[in-house]
A protein has these predicted regions:
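N-terminal accessory segments
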Residues: 1-72
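Conserved class I S-adenosyl-L-methionine
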Residues: 134-144
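Class I SAM-dependent methyltransferase SAM/SAH-binding core
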Residues: 139, 147-195
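A short acidic, Gly/Pro-enriched loop at the edge of an enzyme's catalytic core
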Residues: 194-206
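A short SAM/SAH-binding and catalytic strip from SAM-dependent methyltransferases
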Residues: 205-218
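C-terminal alpha-helical "lid/dimerization" subdomain adjacent to the S-adenosyl-L-methionine
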Residues: 221, 238-282, 287-291
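A short glycine-rich, Lys/Arg-flanked "PGG" loop and its adjoining helix->strand segment in the class I
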Residues: 221-233
């Protein structure tokens, strides 16, 4: 029964989340970090925007983007209404309601799934424990509205954390989201994962959450090569994205529904793509993957 499988998987995710807190991977406050007041304010905006989403879905208007944007600044695969959402990723309005939309989609489990990157990242960075914490650099690629950055800062209070994204609007939302965090300011950079603005061997950790299913196959490979380039030897990559058919066959109907009901043109290819193999081909070692509810997490060492 699909509903039983879903509930069981969600329960296992919550148990994993609590266990990682008990192992001091991150502080307890992250477990109760949902911005309920902001969600309450944004909820009417989400509902009022739904007719626009339905209209785009019905008429397959997948390139309904703000006329003010300079399309030359973005790759073609990015210039679309992913999820049929208003303005794609290219407006302040889209950025302001995105987190709530994701939490509705995942039944409040989005942050728990994001936190699954923290344990492998923390374990991978232990090899640099003889260095000052402030000298360790962690880059979060496709940082979006900054939810992952907040999780990273909770687990890594003294390390240098950088968030990179293509969208000015989402970087602005990320800046708002992380403005009250303790510790050094997190640096935000506009940039493309295909051409990271960092020198070779300059980072110790790279995280990337929910990007790969929105990339064409050839671009996924290109981005993995960039991750490998910027990491120093011994550095760790932790990637989190949608589950795949190979390890979550009981959720195939959910994956198919996601592909059909949301505008996700690269998702059908993604759920069949052998990311583990691609990581090895790029040069990564110790590739490991595990699924948690609707999210699959990979870790790999340069």
């Amino acid at each position: 029964n699909l509903l039983i499988d879903i509930q069981k998987s969600m329960d296992e995710l919550r148990e994993e989340d609590w266990k990682d807190y008990e192992e001091n991977i991150y502080p307890q406050k992250l477990l109760f970090d949902e911005p309920w007041l902001r969600y309450l304010i944004q909820y009417p905006k989400v509902w009022l925007d739904m007719p626009n989403t339905w209209e785009r879905r019905k008429n397959q208007k997948v390139n309904d983007l703000p006329k003010s944007i300079d399309k030359d600044n973005y790759p073609n695969y990015y210039l679309r209404n992913f999820h049929h959402q208003t303005d794609g990723y290219l407006s302040d309005f889209s950025a302001s309601i995105y987190d709530l939309q994701v939490d509705i989609l995942f039944n409040g489990s989005a942050n728990s799934m994001r936190r699954r990157i923290l344990k492998p990242l923390k374990e991978g960075l232990l090899k640099f424990c003889n260095r000052k914490n402030s000298s360790i650099k962690i880059l979060d690629v496709a940082t979006g509205s900054g939810r992952t950055l907040k999780q990273l800062r909770g687990a890594f209070p003294k390390e240098k954390i950088i968030g990179l994204d293509l969208s000015d609007s989402y970087l602005k939302e990320a800046s708002r989201h992380i403005s009250d965090l303790d510790g050094d300011l997190i640096e935000l950079i506009k940039g493309n994962a295909e051409n990271l603005p960092f020198e070779d061997n300059s980072l110790q950790g790279v995280s990337c959450v929910y990007l790969f299913h929105e990339l064409p196959r050839t671009i996924r490979e290109k981005v993995l090569k960039e991750f490998f380039r910027v990491l120093e030897p011994g550095g760790i990559l932790v990637l989190a994205d949608s589950i795949q058919i190979i390890d979550s066959p009981n959720f195939i109907s959910i994956m198919e529904g996601f592909y059909k009901n949301f505008h996700e043109p690269f998702y059908c290819d993604y759920i069949k793509d052998n990311i583990d193999s691609k990581m090895g081909e790029v040069g990564f070692n110790n590739v490991y993957s595990k699924s948690f509810f609707m999210t699959k997490v990979w870790s790999a060492i340069k």
